[in-house]
């Protein structure tokens, strides 16, 4: 009888250890998946904000019957991205911008943080956008 009790205790310990290990693996997997969902949600939110911002900038220019205009590099990026669906590279030329009046964007990726708040040369009127 004592031998059976020992076997039951050992078997219970092995099963409990297996369940704890499996639970920890499940927690780690869930945590990893949750972070992935948060990143995807943040990217979707940012894309929605960029789209709304581009619509606003384009609508303002159309109402005033002017060239599209941006105050920062991010404004130029969202306009080029909105208008260049299906393209990968956009080169934005600023009206009367001189030799520094060109901005190149990879519109398949988000704009880098260090480029977002850079002011645009001259008054920011877009002369042309070329897509590649």
Curated annotation (Swiss-Prot):
InterPro entries: FLIPR (IPR023256), FLIPR/CHIP_sf (IPR038529), FLIPR/CHIPS (IPR023253)
Database matches in Gene3D superfamilies: Chemotaxis-inhibiting protein CHIPS
Record's keyword terms, sorted: Secreted, Signal, Virulence
Disulfide-linked positions: none
Residues spanning the signal sequence: 1-28
Entry superkingdom: Bacteria
Gene Ontology CC entries for this record: extracellular region
Compartment list: Secreted
NCBIfam families per UniProt: PRK13033.1 (NF009592)
Function: May be involved in countering the first line of host defense mechanisms. Impairs the leukocyte response to FPRL1 agonists by binding directly to host FPRL1.
Family statement drawn from the similarity comment of this UniProt entry: Belongs to the CHIPS/FLIPr family.
Protein name in the entry: FPRL1 inhibitory protein
Native source organism of the sequence: Staphylococcus aureus (strain MSSA476)
Taxonomic lineage: Bacteria, Bacillati, Bacillota, Bacilli, Bacillales
């Amino acid at each position: 009888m004592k031998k059976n009790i020992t076997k039951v205790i050992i078997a219970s310990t092995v099963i409990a250890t297996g369940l704890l290990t499996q639970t920890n693996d499940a927690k780690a997997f869930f945590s990893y998946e949750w972070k992935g969902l948060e990143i995807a949600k943040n990217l979707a939110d940012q894309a929605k904000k960029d789209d709304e911002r581009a619509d606003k900038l384009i609508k303002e220019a159309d109402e005033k019957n002017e060239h599209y205009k941006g105050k920062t590099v991010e404004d130029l990026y969202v306009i080029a991205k909105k208008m260049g669906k299906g393209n990968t590279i956009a080169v934005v030329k600023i009206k009367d911008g001189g030799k520094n009046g060109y901005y190149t964007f990879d519109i398949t990726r988000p704009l880098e943080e260090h480029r977002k708040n850079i002011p645009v040369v001259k008054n920011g009127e877009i002369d042309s956008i070329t897509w590649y």
